[in-house]
Each structure stands twice: as structure tokens, then as C-alpha cells.
Amino acid sequence: MRTTYDFAPLWRSTIGFDRLFDLVDAAQQAGTEDNYPPCNVERLSEDRYQISLAVAGFSADEIAITAEQSVLTVEGRKSEKQQREFLYQGISSRPFKRQFNLADYVQVKGASFDNGLLQIELVREIPEAMKPRRISISGSSASNVRQIDGKAA
């Protein structure tokens, strides 16, 4: 049994969280979509990630990887040159399209293809202007403070 949530009350009191609500809606509908090819998403360190897709039967030139704004898309399409007669076909060669939503400042650094495994490296690079910084406090120091002589009343 699936449960759906109504986010309408939150829309009235939040500003700028549109993308978050879209991601939650997409996650609720994720159970109905195809999960081919199988994949792993790993955190390698604080700011490094890796997506591994099992694409046995495909070659590197039959796979396209595109990063557009905050969405990473991996598409594969076999180029069948000759018809084969299979007695049993257990390795799928159907076309696929997998999309991954990327967080802010996450960029694709590279991809490699080896032994039927496509690995995509991701790095989160926060701009210097967005990183926390220490602010110095200016003003009078203890050496500049003068005490005024006062008489007790």
C-alpha cells in the first residue's frame, strides 16, 4: 500500500523550496519506474561520490552521459548490426535512460568504462563565496580604553 502526501499547506508558508518538493514527489513515484540498468551510488569522502551502472553488453560508444543544470542523464542504445538467433537471451540489450538529481554545486568530474561497469565520478565544489568565513571584530581594544576619574557620591 502506497501513501501519498499533500504538500499544499507547506506551499503557502515556504518560499524557494520548489525543487525540494519536486524531488519528494519524484521519490514517491520512483517505485513505478524501471530500474534498469542496476546501479550503486557511493559516497567516497565528504565531497566525492561515485555512480556505478552495470551495463553489460554495451560498449562505451553506445552510452551517452549528459549533465544539464542539476540532472545527470545516462542513456544507452545498442546498435544492432546483425540479427542473431538466441536460444536463450539473459543479457538485456534494451535501450535505457537513467536520471539522477544532483545537489547544488555537485559536478561530474569524469567517467570510466571497464568490464561492463560504467563509473561516473562526482565532486561537490562549494564556491569560496559560499563557504563559511571568520569575521574579525574591529573596535576599541583594552589599551585604547580610558577611564574617567570619578568621585564617589
UniProtKB/Swiss-Prot annotation:
One of its GO terms (cellular component) is cytoplasm. Belongs to the small heat shock protein (HSP20) family. Keywords: Stress response. The gene is hspB. InterPro entries: A-crystallin/Hsp20_dom, ACD_IbpA/B, HSP20-like_chaperone. This is Small heat shock protein HspB. Residues 30-140 form the sHSP domain. The keyword Transmembrane does not apply. It comes from the Bacteria. SUPFAM superfamilies: HSP20-like chaperones.
